[in-house]
């Protein structure tokens, strides 16, 4: 199964963080990334991972 997560640096402290949301579609992850960028966060990246259960 493929999942997508969004990583970013906060605009206030510059700390590296991972979004709490996990997405099954890249399109949804890109929407989250766009929102984070519009809120001033930097180095916003969509990361693709393969997981097995």
List each model region and its residues.
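A short beta-strand micro-motif
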Residues: 4-10
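Short beta-strand/loop motifs in extracellular/secreted proteins, especially
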Residues: 2-4, 42
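Conserved aromatic
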Residues: 23-26
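Short, mixed-charge low-complexity intrinsically disordered segments
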Residues: 18, 31-53
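Acidic, low-complexity, intrinsically disordered interaction modules
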Residues: 13-14
